[in-house]
């Protein structure tokens, strides 16, 4: 039973991301490099957040009680802000690299920013999902019984679906965020930051899984629709894609912008 829970939750959480990687990234070495670079940027943001958290804990002398609750909230908010700052830094790096490539070899076609946004977002999402869910997933192999102290017996399942939504949100956030940077629409960046904060702070409502998941999935659907149109999608292109009649749909042959 524990093995079934482990593999079931693992495929729920990471199955869609794995499919995206296999079908849209794995065949192109350059995309793999950008994916790894995006994951690395997320790791550095986590490291910086951890350093701040450690320093604050030392300053407060590891006090218990309400102080720790406030520190936890502060830590989550700070971590989200740092992640978005590193997303911006990664965009700046990719933009400079793209411009440098064009200046060196004008005939070389650089990857479009839309494609880079998708790949970097998936890198952010996969690394975020791994760090947030792997420890929980390892506990599903046992020993122990979920819910023995009144916790929900659906804890692992809820965590898997929450990890899935966060991974997909990072993909959508990446596409929308990069588009906002390209068009200097700063309200777009603010929207990405605010929705990221909303999804992250929902973890403080952990006993109320229904509220968490419903809210997170509503945000995911809305961000997904936004990212779809930002990436150049339309109702017509979606119809052609679903009917397998569009071989040049969105990501495969994006022209450089």
Curated annotation (Swiss-Prot):
The chain crosses the membrane at residues 5-25, 32-52, 66-86, 115-135, 160-180, 186-206, 213-233. Keywords: Membrane, Notch signaling pathway, Transmembrane, Transmembrane helix. The keyword Transmembrane helix applies. One of its GO terms (cellular component) is gamma-secretase complex. Pfam families: Aph-1. It comes from the Eukaryota. It is a multi-pass membrane protein. Coiled coil: none annotated. It is found in: Membrane. Its main location: membrane. One of its GO terms (biological process) is synaptic transmission, glutamatergic. The keyword Transmembrane applies. Probable component of the gamma-secretase complex, a complex composed of a presenilin homodimer (PSEN1 or PSEN2), nicastrin (NCSTN), APH1 (APH1A or APH1B) and PEN2. Such minimal complex is sufficient for secretase activity, although other components may exist. Interacts with PSEN1 and PSEN2. Belongs to the APH-1 family. Probable subunit of the gamma-secretase complex, an endoprotease complex that catalyzes the intramembrane cleavage of integral proteins such as Notch receptors and APP (amyloid-beta precursor protein). It probably represents a stabilizing cofactor for the presenilin homodimer that promotes the formation of a stable complex. Probably present in a minority of gamma-secretase complexes compared to APH1A. This is Gamma-secretase subunit APH-1B. It comes from Mus musculus.
